[in-house]
Amino acid sequence: MLPPGADSVVVRHGDVGVKSSHVQSDMERTLRDNVAAMLADRGVPGDVEREWGRVLVRSPAPGRAADAAADTFGVVSASPAVSVAPDLDAISDALAAAARAHYDGGAFAVDARRAGTHDFDSHDVNRVGGDAVWAAVEDDFQPVVDLDDPDITFFVEVRDAEAFVFLTHRDGPGGMPLGTQQPLVALVSGGIDSPVAAWESMRRGAPVIPLYLALGDYGGPDHRARAEAAVRTLDDYAPNHDLSLRVAPAGDAIDRLAAATGRTRMLSFRRFMYRVAEHVAEHAGAAGIVTGEAVGQKSSQTTANLGVVDRATTLPVHRPLLTWDKQRITAAARSIDTFRDSSLDVGCNRLAPRQPLTAAPIESVRADEPDALFEWARAVAADTGPVEVAVA
């Protein structure tokens, strides 16, 4: 619902507000720029401003602008609003107009917040604003005030230079503005989990460098196509960042690895994969690696085996989904729109041995894997490059 005359969007952040004033200022500027980039990417007209504690959008299309802002990392919520003078008369007039346009009976409430210096407080806004709503609709309805469980709430936010009247909050992803953390290499397999892990890392402010290992006979065109589709979707959330997919030509190395290993094969494969990611990260200036692993989801993802594969790299391995159930991961994939293109079994399942070890000693893994495994990883990383991902 849009209030009559809506011309603005009030954009709120969360964790940014608990930072020191210097850090908050920097993060708010980044958030402002990211919201502006999201609007431009979607063809939504508007000017984006930063005020302390808020980002404001001035737009002739406030509904579309609010939707774009609500898809921006770091945004907790966005509300299409009408901007008025910060005085009780102007606020009351805007509330009365909103009530005449949208109140259709039942209980209502006025919920006001105020920041800055005024000759009234939020209780005054609630009282005077409630009277204005009541007077606007009492001839046609029998209005009821219910502050605990209203059918419709009229929101007011008063700031130093203006006030905003609005009716809805459009939830955003929260987190931190993208670009406020160092980038991470995100291993993207084409399965359900890895795009969600990459998205969660982006939600906490870290741009990702997507890395896909082309597995040769153990993958295939459909396998790579799912990874490309996932990256296209992730790119929609980062219009002012480069999410070019890096493809590592690992097929020959995987063939040699499969021929040389037995029950520890998947652990050696993951160690090889981490080492490729480490070299790519070093070249790209990334601070770590992101994977979609969750404890116990597969034999290679037991707590013991995760420790074994971690020892293949000196970089931190971030696992945003570490404690998530599969149902939660699947729900998140549906929510961010990566589920459809990543819901089929991925090629690396065909690489797994029949009876994989669930708690392999590191000595056994090292003894079983080829001595040149990490040299293969270095060579594969050297041949890794960005590829063009076609727009669907």
Curated annotation (Swiss-Prot):
Belongs to the ThiI family. Keywords: ATP-binding, Cytoplasm, Nucleotide-binding, RNA-binding, Thiamine biosynthesis, Transferase, tRNA-binding. The keyword tRNA-binding applies. Its main location: cytoplasm. ATP binds at L187, V188, R270, G292, Q301. One of its GO terms (biological process) is tRNA 4-thiouridine biosynthesis. Residues 63-169 form the THUMP domain. One of its GO terms (molecular function) is ATP binding. It is found in: Cytoplasm. It holds the Pfam family THUMP. Its EC number is 2.8.1.4. This is Probable tRNA sulfurtransferase.
